[in-house]
């Protein structure tokens, strides 16, 4: 490592280490390069021995840099028994709501990376993946609210970067874990890493099965424009079964001290079975029954990701100079199969329907990055990148013919859709430091070539090209050793993912249908962030104020079908002007070594408007999460927490508030190699009523679900192995953060 010195001259450095004799070294530096490259330090062993020392102080959980904030999961005892999704609730400026949707600064438009690179398994289903990922396998979670020019321009609110634990030392180490709950859910996993000479391997695998309890659901809609089909009611039950696999394999090889190669692969696969059984009634304005039927549906989505990364890193003899060449391939299948049975009970005919949607996204990415330090602790970075993204969807609808006993495809029901993007980008940026002042600035240019085609209807094909210039700048000022003020401006863009683009018509509910919009443009956002941080030995605080505005926001909207006036239709469009002003606050207080209190929350005022459809909405949204941690003798730990979220504002309504709490007790055995835990989520309430209200001048829709909250579980993990030496890791890699996804996974 190197040490930057204030001016030219001679200095004495005093060095000490436990078990070593203190040493002193004199060094001299010039005005042209006031930096001491430390190199190797040699210290003699101290023959004296120490008695047993018990360290009871707690390390800080949060630290800050010019453009980001870092939450250290390795130092949080609760991470040993929690999944990563639950731990995200404790990360400053991050929120997880009652439906497991993730938000950054109160906004769902952001990106999640793994180890500084985009990850296919996290781009399409982050909640599901993070819920299956043990928090004990995570080292840090970085919140990058002011991404620099090196990052893709997408991700309106910023980036959440998940850094995996790097237990890759000479020798081997591993962890095995298992968990079971009273709600018929179980899971387990293993982590192994080893190093032999210049070769290092890391592997991780997790399996999870969940059987969600039956939930009561209701839906009431009033159609203000159709007196004959005025009132629609649907009452019934919903339940799910799901099974998830997640695996990770990484290998590194040190060619020499200057060159490093790494290859890694990620695998995620989730198979669900969703069931709903509903009684449906339609009544006129006088509340007389028009028709009624029972609807049973079984939906089987299968989705996941296969991802392969290859990186070559070259370091020069200039400290910090780095050249990285990276390639990435991802395959993200997203299949869906739905079978629906309608049984008429009054003025309605029986029928069976079978829909399939075979969708996938393949992506090839190549990237070259170069960073060069310059005198005075500054550095410059530049790079180029190319992405080929191919999205396909094949849609088939079948109806059952009672007379022939065969399935047949209605005319026009088959759709073969293809969406191809070529994205070219180049960037230039720099980081500059002068004593207490730091500046990070850059500019990125992205060109996009877009082709959309329909094999069964060539008249719908289209092609477009466009270029975006994206600037960014962040200023930071350090007040003493423990305080920092940061001001940043970012322009970001967001491209629509397959869930937004897919024209597949979801008719699981024939009276409330939905589909994507392949004509969506990328949305552009401008944001300003002001951040203050104070860190002391016992008290930490991070406060931020931000404002963001988008003039062509991608929003979901609902309307009544003009050809079928009893059917509501939901789709997406660049229809929204969105302004969001927010305040976020994080506090951590440790008055004594064995106790910690934390609080993470924020409040936002959101305003949305669409003049063309005469739609608008505004209001306050907020969230709060707080808890305490106790560390007792004999390696016992107790964690208690609670959270509350205000209703979420939408263009045509709002979603209900949400309350939850939990308690966890941990005990370590055998020198902290074995950890046993018991926990309970929301022990004081069995269910919570989730509500969703959607409305405009033509209709009002009110939906509810009684979500089961109470859950008891136990988990156990065991750590084994021995390690003696570290090996190097690739410092930079590919980051694709340009796709906006939804479809039940972080819906905005």
Segments predicted by a language model, with ranges:
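A short, solvent-exposed loop/turn motif at the edges and junctions
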Residues: 6-28
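Short, acidic, small-residue-rich periplasmic hinge/interaction motif at the N-terminus
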Residues: 14-20, 34-77, 97-99, 105-109, ...
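N-terminal periplasmic accessory domains that precede
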Residues: 39-42, 84-87, 126-128, 143, ...
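Short acidic/polar hinge/loop motifs at secondary-structure boundaries
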Residues: 84, 117-145
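Outer-membrane beta-barrel translocator/receptor signature
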Residues: 153-160, 168-217, 241-246
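Surface-exposed extracellular loop regions of Gram-negative outer-membrane beta-barrel proteins
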Residues: 158-176, 215, 233, 244-250, 449-451, 481-526, 547-565, 683-697, ...
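Outer membrane beta-barrel strand-and-loop segments of large Gram-negative receptors
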Residues: 235, 363-367, 408-415, 420, ...
């Amino acid at each position: 490592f190197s040490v930057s010195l204030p001016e030219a001259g001679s200095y004495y450095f005093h060095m000490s280490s436990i078990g070593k004799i203190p040493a002193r070294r004199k060094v001299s530096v010039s005005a042209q390069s006031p930096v001491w490259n430390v190199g190797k330090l040699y210290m003699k062993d101290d023959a004296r021995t120490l008695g047993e020392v018990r360290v009871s102080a707690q390390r800080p959980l949060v630290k800050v840099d010019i453009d980001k904030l870092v939450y250290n999961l390795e130092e949080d005892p609760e991470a040993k028994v929690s999944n990563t999704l639950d731990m995200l609730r404790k990360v400053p400026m991050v929120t997880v709501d009652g439906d497991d949707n993730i938000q950054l600064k109160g906004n769902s438009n952001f990106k999640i990376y793994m180890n500084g690179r985009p990850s296919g398994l996290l781009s399409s289903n982050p909640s599901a993946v993070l819920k299956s990922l043990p928090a004990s396998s995570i080292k840090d979670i970085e919140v990058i609210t002011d991404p620099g020019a090196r990052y893709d321009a997408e991700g309106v609110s910023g980036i959440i970067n998940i850094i995996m634990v790097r237990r890759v030392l000479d020798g081997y180490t591993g962890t095995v874990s298992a968990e079971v709950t009273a709600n018929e859910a179980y899971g387990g996993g293993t982590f192994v890493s080893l190093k032999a000479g210049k070769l290092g391997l890391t592997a991780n695998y997790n399996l999870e099965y969940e059987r969600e309890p039956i939930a009561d659901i209701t839906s009431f809609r009033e159609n203000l424009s159709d007196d004959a089909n005025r009132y629609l009611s649907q009452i019934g039950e919903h339940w799910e079964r799901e099974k998830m696999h997640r695996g990770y394999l990484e290998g590194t090889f040190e060619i020499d001290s200057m060159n490093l190669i790494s290859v890694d692969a990620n695998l995620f696969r989730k198979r669900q079975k969703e069931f709903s059984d509903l009684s449906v009634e339609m009544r006129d304005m006088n509340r007389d029954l028009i028709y009624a039927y029972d609807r049973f549906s079984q939906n089987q989505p299968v989705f996941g990701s296969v991802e392969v990364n290859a990186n070559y890193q070259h370091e020069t003899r200039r400290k910090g100079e780095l050249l990285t060449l990276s390639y990435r391939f991802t395959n993200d299948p997203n299949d869906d199969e739905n079978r629906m049975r309608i049984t008429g009970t009054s003025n309605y005919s029986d029928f069976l329907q079978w829909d399939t949607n075979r969708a996938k996204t393949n992506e090839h990415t190549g990237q070259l990055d170069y960073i060069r330090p310059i005198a005075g602790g500054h550095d410059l970075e530049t790079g180029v990148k190319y992405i080929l993204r191919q999205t396909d969807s094949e849609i088939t609808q079948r109806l059952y013919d009672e007379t022939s006993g065969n399935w047949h495809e209605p005319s026009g029901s088959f759709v073969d859709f293809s969406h191809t993007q070529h994205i070219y980008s180049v960037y230039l940026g720099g980081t500059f430091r002068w004593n207490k002042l730091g500046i990070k600035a850059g500019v990125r240019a992205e060109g996009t070539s877009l082709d959309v085609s329909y094999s069964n209807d060539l008249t719908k094909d289209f092609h477009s090209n466009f270029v975006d210039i994206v600037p960014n700048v962040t200023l930071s000022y350090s007040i003493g050793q423990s305080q920092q003020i940061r001001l940043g401006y970012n322009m970001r863009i967001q491209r629509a993912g397959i869930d937004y683009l897919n024209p597949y018509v979801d008719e699981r509910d024939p009276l409330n249908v939905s589909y994507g919009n392949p004509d969506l443009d990328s949305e552009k956002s401008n944001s300003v962030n002001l951040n203050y941080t104070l860190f002391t030995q016992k008290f930490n605080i991070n406060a931020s104020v931000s404002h963001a505005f988008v003039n062509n926001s991608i929003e979901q909207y609902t309307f009544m079908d003009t050809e079928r006036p009893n059917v509501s239709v939901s789709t997406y469009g660049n229809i929204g002007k969105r302004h969001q002003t927010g305040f976020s606050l994080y506090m951590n207080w440790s008055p004594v070594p064995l106790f910690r209190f934390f609080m993470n929350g924020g409040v936002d005022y959101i305003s949305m408007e669409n003049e063309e459809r005469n739609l608008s909405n505004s209001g306050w949204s907020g969230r709060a999460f707080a808890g305490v941690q106790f560390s007792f003798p004999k390696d016992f730990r107790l964690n208690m927490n609670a959270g509350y979220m205000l209703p979420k504002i939408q263009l045509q309504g709002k979603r209900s508030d949400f309350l939850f709490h939990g308690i966890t007790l941990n005990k370590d055995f055998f020198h902290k190699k074995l950890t046993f835990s018991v926990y309970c989520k929301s022990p004081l309430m069995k269910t919570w009523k989730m509500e969703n209200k959607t409305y405009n001048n033509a209709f009002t829709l009110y939906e509810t679900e009684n979500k089961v909250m109470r859950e008891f579980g136990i988990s156990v993990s065991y750590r084994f192995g021995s390690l003696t030496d570290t090996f190097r890791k690739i410092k930079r890699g590919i980051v694709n953060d340009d796709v906006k996804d939804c479809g039940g996974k972080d819906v905005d």
